[in-house]
């Protein structure tokens, strides 16, 4: 998926805002996912997914750090996310529809915490980026 110069700018800018707070923001995105879509908790049955748990905080940080890695590799998402794609498809067997649900919650968190930066243009760019990340992650399901 080609990203325009303005897409790249907005994706990079939002990631730079997020990067110092990946644990906090990731935890909030995961908690929102679990609250709004309780069935997604089944993939984390081995973890304490209660509000404020260290496990949710760590998982949220892991998710956002992977997104940060992807944001630095916009032209090579397949390569950058290959191992993660394999893991989700073959080991974890996550329902690919859940990627969209998590992406939505990440966008909600961005809108809440960075209202000045989360302009309509930035929203569209980051949504496009997360859709590309999701598509890359579920590409190995075929």
From Swiss-Prot:
InterPro entries: Globin (IPR000971), Globin-like_sf (IPR009050), Globin/Proto (IPR012292), Hemoglobin_a-typ (IPR002338), Hemoglobin_oxygen_transport (IPR050056). This is Hemoglobin subunit alpha-B. It comes from the Eukaryota. One of its GO terms (molecular function) is metal ion binding. The keyword Iron applies. Red blood cells. Heme b binds at residue 88. Heterotetramer of either two alpha-B chains or two alpha-C chains and two beta chains. The two major hemoglobins, B and C, associate upon deoxygenation to form a trimer of tetramers, BC2, that has a much lower affinity for oxygen than either component alone. It comes from Aquarana catesbeiana (American bullfrog). Belongs to the globin family. One of its GO terms (cellular component) is haptoglobin-hemoglobin complex. Residues 2-142 form the Globin domain. O2 binds at residue 59. One of its GO terms (biological process) is hydrogen peroxide catabolic process. Keywords: Heme, Iron, Metal-binding, Oxygen transport, Transport. The alpha-B chain is a component of adult hemoglobin B.
């Amino acid at each position: 998926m080609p990203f325009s110069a303005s897409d790249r700018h907005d994706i990079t800018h939002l990631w730079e805002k997020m990067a110092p707070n990946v644990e906090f923001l990731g935890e909030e995105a995961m908690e929102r996912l679990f609250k709004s879509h309780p069935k997604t908790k089944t993939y984390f049955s081995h973890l304490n997914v209660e509000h404020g748990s260290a496990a949710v905080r760590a998982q949220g940080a892991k998710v956002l750090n992977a997104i940060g890695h992807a944001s630095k590799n916009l032209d090579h998402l397949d390569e950058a996310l290959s191992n993660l794609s394999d893991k989700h498809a073959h080991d974890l067997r996550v329902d690919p529809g859940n990627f969209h649900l998590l992406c939505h919650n990440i966008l909600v968190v961005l809108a809440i915490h960075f209202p000045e930066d989360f302009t309509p243009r930035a929203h569209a760019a980051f949504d496009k980026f997360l859709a590309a990340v999701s598509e890359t992650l579920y590409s190995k399901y075929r």
